[in-house]
Design a protein with these regions (language model features):
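Sec-dependent bacterial lipoprotein signal peptides
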Residues: 1-21
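Short loop/turn and low-complexity linker motifs enriched in small/turn-promoting residues
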Residues: 20-147
């Protein structure tokens, strides 16, 4: 019985780490521009990034203030330009992860979309990270075209 459970768990992990998810990527020029991290004085930028390979075959939709803005895959990120004020991000997988932040104009915010092993499919957690960590994560990822 234990061997059957172990085999099933191994298959689940393998399924979560491989697969064939695709999203529309931005071109190299847009990616390079986003990685300058320049923000206009009247807006804030929120970078939602997923820089790990875990769950590579799983798209994870992201919504900003109740509106879909895109879906991440492994080694990808979204750059969202928002007005100052309260912003709510929701990322969906086996679970929904919600993050509220108060954006200030002229600032960048970095949100790591951590992928975790779930019961049926991948789970996720949104976490605000410091600028150095966020820039490094974005720099090893590729820009997704926002919806």
């Amino acid at each position: 019985m234990f061997k059957q459970f172990s085999f099933a768990a191994l298959l689940a992990v393998a399924a979560l780490s491989t697969g064939c998810a695709s999203v529309k990527m931005a071109d190299d020029t847009q990616d390079a521009q986003a990685k300058t991290f320049q923000v206009s004085p009247d807006k804030a930028h929120i970078y939602v990034y997923r820089n790990e390979s875990m769950g590579a075959g799983v798209k994870m939709p992201v919504a900003l203030n109740g509106k879909p803005v895109g879906a991440t895959v492994a080694k990808s990120y979204l750059m969202l330009s928002v007005p100052a004020g309260q912003q709510t991000l929701v990322s969906s997988a086996e679970n929904d992860s919600e993050l509220k932040l108060s954006a200030e104009a002229g600032k960048n915010y970095f949100v790591w979309q951590e992928v975790k092993v779930g019961f049926i499919k991948a789970r996720n957690a949104l976490q605000v990270v410091d600028e150095a960590t966020g820039r490094a994560g974005v720099n090893e990822s590729k820009l997704i075209q926002a919806q």
